[in-house]
């Protein structure tokens, strides 16, 4: 697949503080790439450098193999969507969406053609005459996205665009965004601290920590084969067993619980159930290990057949293939 954006030895410093240490990254055309990490990890700074709102201290950013260092944001073939929608309150939905095309003096016939297309894409045709105050938060976000895609940018940059919405609405819009990206074929670069959001939408995820990309891979590879201790503990839930100079990561869903007097060959550890949390489709069971200052989490699903209670002594085990060995 064709490379659309390339970051070559990019570094960002503010005074003497290195915010983004030097690294390189290539992004493919039509890809949905998510920059995922905790607050302050540098993901928004990186996005702003791609957009042109911040300049890298060293290194170069290329779009279609052309350097962007001296190209202002408004001349880059990119648009950006923020968490704050920044809609014009006195304009209707269609007036907000058309604003950029009017500023570029695109012909009226072409404006209307593109407007009808994007209104269908974002499911706002019936709401085109409403003003922002007459819309829900999710509808306002659709307007912001429509305004960003109507001029067919090569790249769409999204800085936590769903962060202000409630959980159920976020879930719904995640699916809509992914389908929209597939239909349009536009490269999406998406910033979030929400792991579930990143997993649901991305072709690849770049997990960031302290300005560095710890790992970049597909959601499945990030989850099943973390390369660093940070990725293993930041993405999802994990049990980290530190023994013999290594870290072995085992996901809670891979931990099996057995009666303490069952087949000893299955057992790796013995312990006592310290707590259990009911979450509808599963229970999180916490086991305090014997002779170790460690609590292990296991997932128990409906139909497992054993109803463990707090205080029960249990044995735990897992397949060796479910361990991920990580550097210390």
List each model region and its residues.
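ABC ATPase nucleotide-binding domain helices that frame the ATP-binding cleft
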Residues: 44-47, 143
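Conserved ABC transporter NBD signature motif
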Residues: 59-67
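Non-catalytic connector elements of ABC transporters
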Residues: 247-328
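ABC ATPase nucleotide-binding domains
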Residues: 32, 71-227
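The feature captures the beta-strand-to-loop junction immediately N-terminal to the Walker
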Residues: 36-38
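Helix-to-loop junction immediately C-terminal to a conserved catalytic motif
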Residues: 51
């Amino acid at each position: 697949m064709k490379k659309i954006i390339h970051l070559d030895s990019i570094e960002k410093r503010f005074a003497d503080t290195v915010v983004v240490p030097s690294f390189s990254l290539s992004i493919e055309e039509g890809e949905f790439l998510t920059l995922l990490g905790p607050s302050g990890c540098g993901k928004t700074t990186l996005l702003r450098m791609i957009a042109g709102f911040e300049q890298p201290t060293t290194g170069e950013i290329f779009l279609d193999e052309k350097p962007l260092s001296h190209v202002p944001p408004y001349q880059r073939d990119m648009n950006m969507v923020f968490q704050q929608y920044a809609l014009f309150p006195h304009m209707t939905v269609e007036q907000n969406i058309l604003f950029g095309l009017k500023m570029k003096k695109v012909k009226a016939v072409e404006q209307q053609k593109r407007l009808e297309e994007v209104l269908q894409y974002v499911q706002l045709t019936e709401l085109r005459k409403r003003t922002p105050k007459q819309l829900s938060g999710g509808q306002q976000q659709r307007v912001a996205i429509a305004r960003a895609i109507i001029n067919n940018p090569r790249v769409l940059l999204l800085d936590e665009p769903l962060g202000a919405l409630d959980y159920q609405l976020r879930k719904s819009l995640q699916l809509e965004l992914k389908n929209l990206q597939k239909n349009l074929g536009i490269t999406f670069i998406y910033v979030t601290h929400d792991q579930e959001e990143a997993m649901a939408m991305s072709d690849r995820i770049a997990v960031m920590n302290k300005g560095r990309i710890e790992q970049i891979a597909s959601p499945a590879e990030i989850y099943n084969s973390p390369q660093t201790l940070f990725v293993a503990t930041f993405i999802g839930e994990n049990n980290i067993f530190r023994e013999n100079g290594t870290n072995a990561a085992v996901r809670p869903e891979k931990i099996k619980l057995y009666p303490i007097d069952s087949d000893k060959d299955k057992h790796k550890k013995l312990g006592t159930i310290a707590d259990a949390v009911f979450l509808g489709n599963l229970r999180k069971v916490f086991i305090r290990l014997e002779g170790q200052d460690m609590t292990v989490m296991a997932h128990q699903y409906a139909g497992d057949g054993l109803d463990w209670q707090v205080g029960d002594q249990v044995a735990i085990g897992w397949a060796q293939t479910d361990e991920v060995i990580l550097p210390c």
